[in-house]
Amino acid sequence: MITHPQVRFEQRGPELVAVEIGQRSCSPLIGSVHRALFALGLDISSYRARPEGGGLVEHLVLERSGGGRIEGALSAEAKAAILPIALQVCVTEG
């Protein structure tokens, strides 16, 4: 059972390639995450959602809008944009 948000960033070396967000709620976060990433020039190239442990797990594969790698400062900015969205679910439900 998912009792608190779980966020797992997938990297290939220094490059951020995907994020997986698990939450208690069954309300998808893709809309909020997409808006935050779009502001950074990032897109979601693939999305999967599955029910798990009474909640929802979303897997998002990321890419730069103009091509190239998501690494360094851009990787840190993407993570910083995603984490508050995932953690906000816990605050509003808790």
Question: Across the structure, where does each feature detected by a protein language model lie?
Answer:
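Regulatory modules associated with amino-acid/nitrogen control
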Residues: 1-94
